[in-house]
Amino acid sequence: EWGFTPENQIGELRSAALPMSLNRQPHYTNGFVIVGDAGGMVSPFNGEGIAPAMKAGRYAAEAMAQALARTHRAGIDRAMSAYPQRIRDEYGGYYQLGRIFVRLIENPRIMRLCTTYGLPIPRLMTLVHKLLSDGFERQGGDFDDRLITTLSKMVPSA
């Protein structure tokens, strides 16, 4: 029987990298779809992956519904190709921003500047909170939402 025993509670510490920034592709090929962690859909900003996985599942299901209405392989593949494109459109630029953000804050001098001068500014922290949490509205929204959306579109897709 499986369980924690004194013999198996101590062992070598091991870890694995989180699959992030859409680094697992293709998201669709030859009738095979990947979503969530399998598709590298973990956010580089915060390590969160449940919401992107659920959204990807919905997008995949919508593409599959369209594909099921097709009778030929070419039509099925065309319908399914909407899924990876939708994932790239939704997360590609945003995740690329996350990769840039991580590279910046890995630098202790930049991080010190951010904490010294950025943390005391509530308005800036509201923007940063939306950015880090993927809590911005991709269409419409306030100035912060539009700024993050614009930045996400300016960088090359992940």
Where would I find each of the regions flagged by the language model?
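FAD/FMN-dependent oxidoreductases across multiple families
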Residues: 1-64, 69
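C-terminal helical "tail/cap" subdomain of flavin- and related membrane-associated enzymes
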Residues: 65-158
